[in-house]
Amino acid sequence: MSELCSVPRVSERFAQSNALDEDIARLKYVSGKREEALRRLGIRTVGDLLLHIPHRYLDFTRSWSIEMAPIGTVCTIIATVDRIVQKQPRPRMQVTEVSLVDETGVLQVAFFRQPWIAQQLKQGDRLAVMGKVEFAYGFKQMASPHFEKLEEGRAAGTILPVHYVSDGVSQAWMRRIVSGALEVVGNPFDPIPARLRVKRRLMSNARALRSIHFPSSMAERDIARRRLAYEECLYLQLALRLRNDGGLVDVVPYAHTAGEHLAALKQALPFSLSDEQEVAFQDILRDMCDGGRVMNRLLLGDVGTGKTAVAACALAVAADSGTQACVMAPTGVLARQYADKTGPLLSQAGMSWALLTGATPAAERERIHAQLESGELDVLFGTHAVLSDDVAFKHLSLVVIDEQHRFGVGQRNALRAKGPGADLLVMTATPIPRTLALSVYGDLDTSIIRHRPVPGAGVTTRVLTESSRDLAYGAIREAHAKGQQAYVICPLVEPSDSADELEDVPGIARDDEGRVTVPVPLHDTATELDRLRLALPGLVIERLHGRMPAGEKDRVIDAFKRGEIDVLVSTTVVEVGVDVPNATVMVIENGERFGLAALHQLRGRVGRGSVSGTCLVMTHSKGNGGASAAQDRLQSLEKTSDGFTLAQMDLRLRHEGEILGYRQHGDVTLRFVDLDADEELIEWAHLDAVELLRYACTLDSVATRPLRDAVATRYRHIFKEVSGG
């Protein structure tokens, strides 16, 4: 451990470290209004301020003359204001045109809906503008670039940070405040052990913070970002692992043994496990049979890759060991499907099981409770209902959670608490890039199944515009003529629902506050139900959405499974778990509203039987600007059926939290890590976190306490679960 952690000796540097926790109100230049503005940005402490890094830089070391600035490229140009003209080409459209000149030419700059700029600038002002250079009407032009008035005598070879600011704090004042904060903090003790900094070739924390805000070169900025990204990843890995292990310090892991139930279950399966499935199961079996540690494993698999069969094998191992297992799913639909598909296999293997949901009748619920407490039941399938205080197991040794990201951490821990020392297996059919899995599931060992054990008929995907709607209706009619069924997916439930309740997806223009700024017709299930009943007479069409009572949802899904409904108009409630092999067509309205991973999950509902499926993604994109980008993104669905490839594309375009649904259920937002480019760095942080905790399981020693404190400060919301806060 001595190689990893050096004991701090300089008390002054600890005092400077504590300065990071000081309230921003104590900083120089932070007045009442500026304090309010900073707090609106989520900045409450000096540490928050220093982690509020620039989102771009004005690089005067690489500025261009107007003549040499390349067209189609984002450039920084330093020039002088020659003329300012305000125009109003149409109602509510104000344009401020600024002509900039240097010794080589003229640059026409247009600012839209920013009339105050005319009051901020005057002829003769020296500006630095950064934006994309275009050419039209004989002049080079920029549209709404970022600009900075240069102070008299400013050196041309500097780099200016550009922060996100709020009313009450200008860019200039933000720089002054950040500079003052860096002075207050000085050169604090670095929580990351010196051994790791040398091993990973990282600059110190203090230097990284200075360099990320005020770099002398963009290369220095990149080195600083690398240090802060590693720090972010390491802290997150440690926080997640400490949280996961915090309640397990005094428990004794259970050493399972495989036996007759497992052998019988494998015989009952309609197919042999594929090589990938077998590797994943052996990972799980090794963990379950290890009496020295509790299993914490993520089983990650694309749609139809057979995760359920692997999980069933784990359930059999628990039964072979004379203990119980619980499978928790996010919806009653999915829990019932697990019971319907897996239950008969368990019965053939000599295991007893039951299903418990919110809709379970009281008498049945009492019977299940009694069988659990007596040990008569081997496996319980259920929803959040299994978390009820009156659900008690005789000996719960395995917890399986499906679609982990749809549950809060507290729910996961509550179920696990019903069996101290229970192994944990979480599963998801949402393809997640490896870097993202290592980051946000850093507390879990990962097994991946990429390919289907039994190749299905497949799905053909086409992206259609509104003008091709007849093709979509024709596909539904053709499927119906063959005795097959269809889904129509809408982003909204009712016409009154707000567009701004939806996730922010590339391709839709929004203003700075996230509001939709272009008129995009949004489809809702209520209106679509009426429209389809008119367009497709003679077909039985019903709708399904998450606001329906559980019993009503079950009724509709059962009717669809029995073939009594021809077309199901639904929200994304069918994204996970609805398995109707006779459904062969899916039409997704407003495809630009969904991420690639979600679209891939949705299309996985068709083509599940012996007949190939058709997925038609409707878009209102017109082929220009952001709409063109949205259409390009959607067309990648036509080119690949690999969910992991699509997830990697999604990661480049969207926030990691949007892929996993973390806006409601998650722990983290990664501000420094580039999940697409930092794979090696993320791997380092993962390995280093494991090594640190191997030698100091709680980071509570004198040598590691500063690191633990830094982790607790950065990820308070995660770490408080370790201390019981």
Feature-to-residue mapping (PLM):
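Long, highly charged, low-complexity intrinsically disordered interaction regions
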Residues: 1-28, 36, 236, 246
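OB-fold nucleic-acid-binding modules
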Residues: 52-82
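Inter-lobe coupling/hinge segments of SF2-like helicase ATPases
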Residues: 290-635, 698
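Accessory helical-bundle/CTD segments and flexible terminal tails appended to RecA-like ATPase motors
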Residues: 558-581, 586-589, 604, 608, ...
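Upstream accessory/linker segments immediately N-terminal to the RecA-like ATPase cores of bacterial MutS
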Residues: 34, 71, 87-268, 662
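Short, surface-exposed secondary-structure boundary micro-motifs
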Residues: 80, 132-133, 239, 591, ...
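N-terminal pre-P-loop "Q-motif" helix
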Residues: 271-295, 309
